[in-house]
A protein has these predicted regions:
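Alpha-helical protein-protein interaction scaffolds
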Residues: 1-33, 38
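Compact, basic/aliphatic-enriched, mixed alpha/beta core segments that act as assembly/interaction modules
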Residues: 1-8, 95-97, 103-106, 120-126, ...
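Short, compositionally biased P/S/T/A/G/V-rich stretches that sit at domain boundaries
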Residues: 30-61
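Contiguous beta-strand segments within globular domains
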Residues: 54-89, 126-128
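Lumenal/extracellular ectodomains and adaptor appendage modules
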Residues: 67-68, 75, 88-96, 112-116, ...
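Beta-strand elements of well-folded, non-transmembrane domains
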Residues: 71-79, 90-96, 133-137, 155-157
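Extended low-complexity, serine/threonine- and proline-enriched intrinsically disordered segments
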Residues: 84-115, 148-155
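Acidic, serine/threonine- and proline-rich intrinsically disordered appendage/tail regions
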Residues: 116-130, 135-183
Length: 183
């Protein structure tokens, strides 16, 4: 949550997230404590100079042990976004019994919840990333616990914004500033 967002941006983001994050009896309240992201924001909720940014995240635990992360991504006003030039990286981490943190080997599912994803309405687009815990059949499954996430948004192969919870994961697993061109 970003308490210093302008009221209009906060209202747009809340409206979109409220439609998608109606609580279910099996879910827990969103967690945002210990989240780390870029602290410097302009009046649009974006980092100065960024084309896209994360304006909110919502995290819930599900009854089956999976975790859902809702990510609200906003574009700078009056800039036409080419969705093919945008990449979102979502990394979930686990901790073993010795306290070692590692990238999950479980399948991570992502789904855009607000198609078409084009930022033409000047409202945040919503992405859901789902972490599924290791299957009990996995030999290491009982030794692993969910640790947290790191999210990075890239536009034209350049980092635009990041979020991590706990924040130490971003320090321990820094994202590259630029992605290699896919040409």
């Amino acid at each position: 949550n970003l308490p210093n967002l302008p009221q209009q941006l906060r209202a747009q983001t809340e409206r979109r997230l409220t439609l998608l994050s109606a609580p279910t009896p099996a879910s827990t309240p969103p967690l945002v404590a210990n989240e780390q992201g870029s602290d410097v924001r302009d009046e649009f909720g974006l980092q100065p100079g960024a084309t896209l940014g994360i304006v909110d995240t919502r995290f819930t635990d599900e009854a089956n042990g999976s975790k859902n992360l809702l990510i609200a991504i906003k574009s700078r006003p009056d800039i036409k976004i080419d969705p093919r030039q945008m990449t979102v990286h979502v990394f979930f981490y686990e901790r073993d019994q010795a306290g070692n943190k590692s990238l999950t080997e479980s399948k991570v599912l992502t789904e855009w919840l607000s198609p078409p994803v084009n930022w033409s309405e000047q409202e945040p687009e919503l992405l859901r990333a789902t972490y599924n815990p290791p299957l009990p059949s996995d030999a290491n499954a009982t030794n692993l616990a969910y640790e947290g996430y790191v999210v990075g948004i890239y536009y034209n192969n350049e980092i635009q914004d990041t979020r991590a919870n706990p924040g130490s994961l971003a320090d321990d697993n820094p994202l590259p500033l630029y992605l290699k061109s896919q040409t």
